[in-house]
Amino acid sequence: MASNSTKSFLADAGYGEQELDANSALMELDKGLRSGKLGEQCEAVVRFPRLFQKYPFPILINSAFLKLADVFRVGNNFLRLCVLKVTQQSEKHLEKILNVDEFVKRIFSVIHSNDPVARAITLRMLGSLASIIPERKNAHHSIRQSLDSHDNVEVEAAVFAAANFSAQSKDFAVGICNKISEMIQGLATPVDLKLKLIPILQHMHHDAILASSARQLLQQLVTAYPSTRMVIVSLHTFTLLAASSLVDTPKQIQLLLQYLKNDPRKAVKRLAIQDLKLLANKTPHTWSRENIQALCECALQTPYDSLKLGMLSVLATLSGTIAVKHYFSIASGNVGSSPRSSDLVKLAQECCYHNNRGIAAHGVRVLTNITVSCQEKDLLALEQDAVFGLESLLVLCSQDDSPGAQATLKIALNCMVKLAKGRPHLSQSVVETLLTQLHSAQDTARILMCHCLAAIAMQLPVLGDGMLGDLVELYKVIGRSATDKQQELLVSLATVIFVASQKALSAEVKAVIKQQLESVSNGWTVYRIARQASRMGNHDMARELYQTLLTQVASEHFYFWLNSLKEFSHAEQCLTGLQEENYSSALSCIAESLKFYHKGIASLTAASTPLNPLSFQCEFVKLRIDLLQAFSQLICTCNSLKTSPPPAIATTIAMTLGNDLQRCGRISNQMKLSMEEFRSLASRYGDLYQASFDADSATLRNVELQQQSCLLISHAIEALILDPESASFQEYGSTGAAHADSEYERRMMSVYNHVLEEVESLNRKYTPVSYMHTACLCNAIISLLKVPLSFQRYFFQKLQSTSIKLALSPSPRNPAEPIAVQNNQQLALKVEGVVQHGSKPGLFRRIQSVCLNVSSTLQSKSGQDYKIPIDNMTNEMEQRVEPHNDYFSTQFLLNFAILGTHNITVESSVKDANGIVWKTGPRTTIFVKSLEDPYSQQIRLQQQQAQQPLQQQQQRNAYTRF
């Protein structure tokens, strides 16, 4: 079973080399473990983590760890050390060990060795296993005993194990706390050992009493041992304990501020700042105004730039949270106090022009956060200070290529974007500063500044026209070399130009871009610029760039991919010629667009591979094709009112049938079909949305907008023609347009609002169906198609990758072979799964739980038909499980009372942290053959045999009577 399930799990893994199935790979490693050469044994041991990564199901992992435990038991210390490292690297797979008792028994046998190094490695091994054996009393006893050892290596290992078990087990933490306390306070304990014992106290957070006793001990240590190392370790442990227990966080903040203010040692001050930063990130709501005020006073008084930088970093973190609002809300309640006169603002204003770049960056960050957060206050002076500080920082850092200067520049540019969004009236001066500085900046800084300009232009498109001229002039003079930075700058600047140009690019701008690309750019740069053009709706530019790339690729898959993009861009370009009130021209434009779309989907299908099936891209384009066809069909239906008006007897037919719509003739039925078609398309867009778990938010919003377009047209058909009396417009408001994140979304929302206003004005005004109604529908279609389609990032690039692999037990040796089960028994189906991630797990969303749906259908009956309750004929079950360390498992009991072959389907979907369900798959199928149990079969045969003589006697009697 394990072999087959794991083999199917790896069937689609493309590692580029000849892969073995799980059993073969394990046998290869087992052969190495049995080798007489130490080098081969070590090589086999260290290859186990890769085996676990490729075959992450419990049966193989259990077998592998048992083999490693045998090596640990009989091998030398070097092999034991290798096994320990493998165990620590494979921590997420430890819960998949099925025979925990046997595994621990083999490991634990080494604890009785006379070799202290062997005992030390065993203790570290037990500590690494604390997550699966937190309450093993023999392990607890061995750790306590080893803490009293005279061998330093063994004692250090015991300290490591004690820390791990304290984090996992409340009983162990309660039992070991007093012993740790005695050892720390004991005179015989060396100082180095005390420094290693103190961090164990950070895990004493399982209950309030334990945490309180640990805090008291740490308080005594800080007072009794004033040496620098002891104070640093004790304070940091103090902070971690407070952050975990949450109860004593305000006291800990006060203690750290006290040491920051009064202790003269810079090392202690640095530690206090580091811990304050940790608490500011984790619990900003626990900071009082007095805490922030004390930190400001320390920063104002300190003469050391390094300490001032650290304190400002803490204040910058707090300024972006609720703490700063609390600070100013209390300050404004004091007589004669205002935000402009507070120490926090005074400190930030002083630091904005500091000669240290880091201090200046944090100063403007604090000012920006205050300006954006406290919008209800009159902060004109602070706004100007923030803008001037950002300008000076921009001038300073844009001329420097060093990593420190670029990091500071990123902070300043982020503040500019935040300021432009929070205070739109400041955006014009921010943009002018960026454009002025763009000409003289270094290439590295230019790239970052272009990203900033693009972000501001996306939020405030009204600024785009003003910056376009400067950007085009700059584009003419850059790109004199083919360095990576120059290529990156070409892409960044082209992106800003696409964002800034609200409509189609002018011929002059296109000529400038193409001229630069022809001179110094490589193919990858051209592709990235074309990709941005497709994203921003500049399809004519994108088509020309894709055309130039077709002959520059070596793979046919890449050729077909680029060709499909060229055809899609050409198809969208055809729709730019649409004009309102010109419906025949609209039909020809849509037909022309569909022609290129069909060419493109053929190329896109040819570009897909088993490892990269391009499923999202294909489905998105198919939906676009179907949507265009539905639009075309609806325009033809509207035109049919002229070409095929209602017959003269239509009113009589309507009265006879009792359906008032029949007086409109055949158009009423066609409109009903169109409405159902658009609702079906909206449902398919919804399915695509749910299947795109790894997509970025902009792509998902794009899919959502396409779905809303379909719903809008179906609603318009219903409100104008099919059911104008019951049409409601309350749920369709103009909310959301102000919060649009892109120009495409902004334009689509504007079209939606305009169409809804037109439909509402016509609703109940004219009796359906009139030419006014059909014209309104056709104009709505043209308005939607005139907004250039945006191909978002997920169409080109997958930043997050998440997949689920399922293994079913029992599973047949051959996938087509059914599993035999008796009809009077239930099948226990075990479903195991592994969540696999790419290089950036959880970038957009994470899996909170996995929903497993199991259903069975009868494929073919065998034997006689019996009357069986309907409940026994089908199985339909659902369970939710939460993955732990990317692994989950559950079981289902299935009933197969009807004899025959049943098809079992297991389908998985996931729920993210926001409670949204995503249909990610996969879908797995196995077959079960339900057989009659022997006892029932025997009874049935006996009954048949008993009935045979009776039937023969009845036949003789019948012959006799005859």
Swiss-Prot record:
The modification Phosphoserine is found at S338, S809. GO terms for cellular component: chromosome; cytoplasm; INTAC complex; integrator complex; nuclear body; nucleus. SUPFAM superfamilies: ARM repeat. Pfam families: INTS7_C, INTS7_HB, INTS7_N. It is found in: Nucleus; Chromosome; Cytoplasm. It comes from the Eukaryota. One of its GO terms (biological process) is RNA polymerase II transcription initiation surveillance. Disulfide bonds: none annotated. Its main location: nucleus. InterPro entries: ARM-like, ARM-type_fold, INTS7, INTS7_C, INTS7_HB, INTS7_N. Keywords: Chromosome, Cytoplasm, DNA damage, Nucleus, Phosphoprotein. Belongs to the Integrator subunit 7 family. Component of the Integrator complex, composed of core subunits INTS1, INTS2, INTS3, INTS4, INTS5, INTS6, INTS7, INTS8, INTS9/RC74, INTS10, INTS11/CPSF3L, INTS12, INTS13, INTS14 and INTS15. The core complex associates with protein phosphatase 2A subunits PPP2CA and PPP2R1A, to form the Integrator-PP2A (INTAC) complex. Interacts with NABP2. Component of the integrator complex, a multiprotein complex that terminates RNA polymerase II (Pol II) transcription in the promoter-proximal region of genes. This is Integrator complex subunit 7. It comes from Bos taurus (Bovine).
